[in-house]
A protein has these predicted regions:
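Acidic, surface-exposed loops and disordered segments
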Residues: 1-222
Length: 222
């Protein structure tokens, strides 16, 4: 698979098969992803691979906090408002997701259960917790670099026939995850990457995706 094909075909997977991903395959992907660029070659990312009983424990804890109505206090502040054009895009993908599942807007129970499924990482058998050191002098640049390796990892996974979903809900309740990770007291949990084999027949993995026209985001200066 060439790079262009991987970029165009990769999508967020929201239903995974239960099959475990071989550890050596995950290791290969991570070994290649570490060649992602970073500012000054600092490579500030730190990645935890969570599987097996540890992942089961995390999913239970994560959903438990959601069910209890525990306030979300993520390490990295999440957006509270958007410019109107971004808000429209965010709302549109939410509508597409629910429509693919046949969940009506007024179906409170259906929406709640889908949220719980999301907090279980769509049943992915592997979670990669993407972190940076909180002692970094520039958190913003470290996060930029973390985004670079995250995208690289997702493209490499797609090339191997795997699916990914970059998930904020994996780090909404940091203690649910941090309690399972060694030496994580000085880490900022920025995002989770759900990893596994995609259920290619699931409607939620096949709805039409959209991207804004090039003219909306690119300005030529000559």
């Amino acid at each position: 698979m060439d790079v262009r094909q991987a970029v165009r075909e990769r999508r967020s997977i929201r239903k995974f098969k239960p099959d475990q991903v071989p550890e050596n395959l995950v290791r290969e992907i991570l070994d290649e992803a570490r060649w992602a660029p970073s500012w000054g070659n600092t490579q500030p990312w730190e990645l935890y691979v969570v599987t097996g009983e540890a992942l089961k424990e995390f999913k239970i804890a994560n959903c438990g906090k959601l069910d209890e109505g525990v306030p979300s206090v993520p390490d990295i502040k999440m957006p509270e408002s958007w410019p109107e054009r971004l808000k429209k895009r965010y709302s549109a993908v939410g509508r597409s997701t629910l429509a693919a599942l046949g969940i009506a807007r007024e179906d409170t129970n259906g929406r709640t259960e889908q949220t719980r499924t999301m907090f279980r990482l769509f049943d992915a058998p592997c979670l990669i917790a993407a972190c940076i050191d909180k002692r970094s002098s520039s958190i913003e640049y470290a996060l930029l670099n973390l985004g670079l390796i995250t995208q690289t990892l997702c493209l490499l996974a797609h090339d191997r026939g795997l699916g990914t979903c970059i998930m904020a809900c994996a780090v909404c309740f940091p203690s649910a995850l941090r309690n399972l990770l060694p030496d994580a007291e000085n880490k900022l949990l920025a995002a989770g990457i759900a990893l596994g084999y995609p259920d290619r027949n699931a409607p939620i993995n096949n709805f039409a995706r959209e991207r804004a026209p090039l003219e909306e985001s690119v300005i030529w200066v000559k």
